[in-house]
């Protein structure tokens, strides 16, 4: 591949499509970040950031948060709706509301609110989230209260009204209304109520049941009418100010958004006709992120832009208002994934590898060797004269026969190992002879790429840092941070540190699609090999679990400055003491046990006892990941 170039590297890893312009490959073959997408500003080298974080005591793995990407995501979303409203002559306003469940890290929420400067509100879906939101929302700011509610939740939301916040208390279950009426009367507070309706429209995708008729939340048409009637009977219909619905999360197809908005717009018109003074429509989530860069209807992609999304939301409401002579409502979106996914990158390193050997140094079987070895050797030596598919099938048959003979005690371990070596050599040779442009070759090419892929063992826990990969086969872009000026001469499957076969990434961005192996410059034992796992800023931190007691990773924030960038907010990940405490192991009790056992250990002198105890103490203080 002597014609390899940085342009080809961008194509192979599809960087320009999934990165949103925030990440690129430099002429030196290194991954760089452009947090504000300003081409005039020098890009930030990710490997350099990892080195600086290590200098500050944060080894790998480390989660890097680019705060300026959060700013740019907020600006892009608000600008898209502003432009869509100008184009349609829309007379309502727009506010982005951030659902903190997507990423509750305080610095993330604070950055979004601070940079939003009145353009962004917050959404809470539980009492703990509400307590955080009531503290972080600036005076006069917007708060949307979703989720299941008890009396205390309702009371806290009404207290938010007393604190001067624009709190919208959304009725998601009909039973919640009576609690609201009682608590509002008890506190003497006039609430701003929202009503979440359950649309028939479903946005296809991995989370499609978060919207539509099967949704966990929301009122049916009959329940919505009953809520209106109850409010009217109580003389409180003027409390109903907001219509809320949710099409789904990560909707890949713009047509689903268009259809859902038409249905939702009718709800707005009907509620106004019933006398409810609804003045805000909260369209919920759904705005996607193109994780795989294919710009398609694939569940991990999206076939539209933020601007197209904004246009379809605005135009649907504009159309029904013009047709019915209604005031244009203010619009709220809850696009938390689109706000936060891009800003976080997990940087880790390869700690070991397992490579399938090729045909170098392969020796012919001895004359007395079992027949199956000679048959496999005949396939190997005759590859140039045979059709690749025929040779593969014969070699596969020979390997299966050798494995069966071994199981019956006919072949010994050495014979089996030789059979596997010849098989591997055949597969490597066939891989070079297959042409991906020929349809009959493609299936075998994919199979061989998977069989011959290197296994690279990486210093992270998939269950802690990328739980959606295990849970829903989510795709996250992965690529080396260096050496991308070299051709990807190998393919690999990435394994994590856990003692679990599911701790493996099985889908990788590759050009305009997803493959089961990742193209890489060859890993060389003993050399640092850094990998970046991108777009992990939404949901992954809070959903991560402690399988094998691997805890939170180190994290650090990156902020642009006039001179380049600065690291801030360095947070050390969990120590072994931390994770043991989560499962009810007291470090002091453990220390006491260690001391007793060191004293009782035979054959240790005083110096050895002291060193043994020091090592055990250091182990409790250590990072849960490997020291590299």
Curated annotation (Swiss-Prot):
Task: Identify the gene encoding this protein.
Answer: speA
**Which InterPro entries does the UniProt record give?**
Ala_racemase/Decarboxylase_C, Arg_decarb_HB, Arg_decarbox_C, Arg_decrbxlase, De-COase2_CS, De-COase2_N, De-COase2_pyr-phos_BS, Orn/DAP/Arg_de-COase
Q: Which UniProt keywords apply?
A: Decarboxylase, Lyase, Magnesium, Metal-binding, Polyamine biosynthesis, Pyridoxal phosphate, Spermidine biosynthesis
Quote the pathway field.
Amine and polyamine biosynthesis; agmatine biosynthesis; agmatine from L-arginine: step 1/1
Name the cofactor(s).
Mg(2+); pyridoxal 5'-phosphate
Source species, domain of life:
Bacteria
Q: Does the keyword Magnesium belong to this entry?
A: yes
Q: Which molecular function terms from Gene Ontology are attached? A: arginine decarboxylase activity; metal ion binding
What is the name listed in the Swiss-Prot or TrEMBL entry for this protein? Biosynthetic arginine decarboxylase
* Functional note: Catalyzes the biosynthesis of agmatine from arginine.
The family annotation for this protein states: Belongs to the Orn/Lys/Arg decarboxylase class-II family. SpeA subfamily.
The record ties this protein, via Pfam families, to: Arg_decarb_HB, Arg_decarbox_C, Orn_Arg_deC_N
* Origin species: Alkalilimnicola ehrlichii (strain ATCC BAA-1101 / DSM 17681 / MLHE-1)
